[in-house]
Amino acid sequence: QLDLRKYDLIMSSSHAFAKGILTSPDQLHISYVHTPMRYAWDQMYTYLKQSKLSKIGFEFPIRLMLYKLREWDFYSSQRLDYVISNSNFTSKRIKKYWGLESEVIHPPVDIKRFNYKNSRGNFYISLNRLVPNKRVDLLIKAFNKLNLPLIIIGDGPERLKLEKISNSNIKFLRKISDKEVEKYMSRCKAFVY
């Protein structure tokens, strides 16, 4: 437990637990929310289906735990003084699951980092964590069908599975520097998310 009693203003950046910090009535708590917990709300069954624990007989206790987590997520959100969301989509999720209004402030991007090149490469790019909820598998299926060149930058537990379903037009890059990301972003035909 963090001791935040000496601060008048608490700002949290949260997709799960940071917004749940306990504050006093004298403190103002502003939370920048990336999403209400997906695994406790609309994507619970997707996460359960993909969980190794549910495959070995733990689905019921996990489901019970996720329902309790959903309750906590809701009640902890009600203690926030002001909510900022990172997108219109997240704002709708906050309204739906927490019943709260939020102001949208998109994450900042220093666009000067990305030098536009007149000579574009003949490839598309995706920058992602390779996890189930990002649905990179759908992107791969589309690019397999279109046979267009795609570079996927990122890593995660789904990488090997995604590499197996990819045709030769799709290339994976892991752990590359920010400078290399900038180079690919400035040369690609389009960014795909």
PLM segments and residue spans:
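Active-site donor-binding segments of glycosyltransferases and PAPS-dependent sulfotransferases
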Residues: 1-17
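Active-site proximal beta-strand in glycosyltransferases
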Residues: 9-12, 23-55, 84, 103
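Membrane-proximal helix-turn-helix segments that form the acceptor-binding/catalytic region
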Residues: 50-83, 91
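Acidic anion/phosphate-binding donor-loop and adjacent secondary structure
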Residues: 92, 96, 103-104, 108-122, ...
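Conserved donor-binding/catalytic core segment of Leloir-type glycosyltransferases
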Residues: 109, 115-151
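Nucleotide-activated donor-binding/catalytic signature segment of Leloir-type glycosyltransferases, i.e.
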Residues: 160-183
